[in-house]
Amino acid sequence: MKYRTRKLIKPEDLNPRKTLFGGRVLQWIDEEAAIFAICQLNSPNIVTKAMSAINFVSTAVVGDIIEFGMDLVKVGNTSITIACDVRNKITKQSIVRIDEIVFVLLDENGKPTPHGKSKNI
């Protein structure tokens, strides 16, 4: 898995317990995974179709640097599936894991369309 993007945890990223808000990290994951999918398919015409179980393993606090790892795990006819791991940059401890995030390529009418890619993207 390659870790590409990093974020510094700031006070506005926290929940009332002063730890990283789950909704915030999910927003970042969806954005980072979408960028990864767009780059793999060479098209911005994608949508998030599904996410498998979201496993919150640990948390982060103000000042932590987290990084997002993405890996291509499956290529379908109109879709690709990505695995994601968010971890603490310094300790390498996993914070959130998602085994499958599915993106679908859409045509100009918003319908799924074959992307013509293989596992060797």
Kindly give the residue locations of the regions a language model identified.
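Short alpha-helix capping/helix-loop boundary micro-motifs
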Residues: M51-N55
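Hot-dog-fold acyl-thioester-processing enzymes
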Residues: M1-A50, V104-I121
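HotDog/MaoC-like acyl-thioester-processing domains
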Residues: M1-T5, F56, V61-V62, V73-I121
